[in-house]
Amino acid sequence: MALQAASLVSSAFSVRKDAKLNASSSSFKDSSLFGASITDQIKSEHGSSSLRFKREQSLRNLAIRAQTAATSSPTVTKSVDGKKTLRKGNVVVTGASSGLGLATAKALAETGKWNVIMACRDFLKAERAAKSVGMPKDSYTVMHLDLASLDSVRQFVDNFRRTETPLDVLVCNAAVYFPTAKEPTYSAEGFELSVATNHLGHFLLARLLLDDLKKSDYPSKRLIIVGSITGNTNTLAGNVPPKANLGDLRGLAGGLNGLNSSAMIDGGDFDGAKAYKDSKVCNMLTMQEFHRRFHEETGVTFASLYPGCIASTGLFREHIPLFRALFPPFQKYITKGYVSETESGKRLAQVVSDPSLTKSGVYWSWNNASASFENQLSEEASDVEKARKVWEISEKLVGLA
């Protein structure tokens, strides 16, 4: 996301990343529509109970066949001229109501090859955002998802499955950032909010939807977790204090509740900027652990990326006015690292669909206008043993173990 090089201006400037967790809108067929019509017709039936039963059964079977035809389609279909064509892919993008998530949703929708499920916390905001950028109505669906609530994550998965729509790609993009906070804020389950939203919510979502990805007949199934340069301490931006450091994970193991454990993963004093950076390290460790555990078995491509510094994103909207005024030109003319939301969205869309980016376990990056390349992660962000521990502790915290 966009936090990336913000720290280059000054460690005194802190960056706010708002949870872009929203939900999605139209492209699924609602079986309740069929159910309503069945009820109306059955009520109007006259005659013997046997006749009513037969007619009701016939209508039910018709509705089931109609729903199946509407929500499931083979990977390859035949066009009017008889040529084989690939069906549209279905991609879930979290935090798709603004910033990188919205730009990605738009880039994918405009290809005409994807149905985008915009998984967002604010349903109306997501609907307005999709319309404002001109996304075709039949290219997206808004569904509610609040990653700060594990119950909401489970409800989203349940609602998605009720649509009987295949899942081909999951993009874990949404995040929150509280750089100026003096005290921690907590999620519904009592976890520090940055880690709860950015890591634990996505961890549960990805674990649950992995079963859906496995079932997909799409040629290239992918699970993508957006990383950040600020959590990668082998970069200049990653070395600006406070640096990411998970320590021995004592805070994570204690539940990040600020009561019988620290609200910070490493067990230290609360720091909003560091909490965000630590959560992004967890994201990158999680991607690699998914790769090690499931790539060979499932064929799913697991990847992370840093799309560049989106200096003009709404991520910084709650920062001090001076920072908001100076940061974009600083990135454009001094560091040359500035990337527009549109360009960053195209980059993430590339990781979603480009046939040349199917390598699993990779952290993708770009240099200015250069093509994508495999970037190196820091020692901590690529620590195999720490990734295993983060995975196992996270399983317990979200109720999977």
Swiss-Prot record:
Main location: plastid
Enzyme class: oxidoreductase
Any coiled-coil regions, as ranges: none
Tissue expression: Expressed in flowers, upper leaves, rosette and cauline leaves, stem. Not detectable in non-photosynthetic tissues such as roots and seeds. Expressed in seedlings and adult plant.
Gene disruption: observed consequences: No visible phenotype at the levels of the whole plant or chloroplast ultrastructure; due to the redundancy with PORC. Porb and porc double mutants have a seedling-lethal pale-yellow xantha phenotype at the cotyledon stage, contain only small amounts of Chla, and possess chloroplasts with mostly unstacked thylakoid membranes.
Boundaries of the annotated transit peptide in chain numbering: 1-66
UniProt xrefs under InterPro entries: NAD(P)-bd_dom_sf (IPR036291), Prochl_reduct (IPR005979), SDR_fam (IPR002347)
Induction of synthesis: Circadian-regulation. Not regulated by light.
Metabolic or biological pathway, per its Swiss-Prot or TrEMBL entry: Porphyrin-containing compound metabolism; chlorophyll biosynthesis
Localization per record: Plastid, Chloroplast outer membrane; Plastid, Chloroplast thylakoid membrane
Subunit structure: Part of the FLU-containing chloroplast membrane complex composed of FLU, CRD1, PORB, PORC, CHLP and HEMA1. Interacts with CDF1 in chloroplast.
Additional notes on this entry: The presence of TOC33 is required for the import of PORA into plastids in cotyledons and true leaves.
Name of the protein: Protochlorophyllide reductase B, chloroplastic
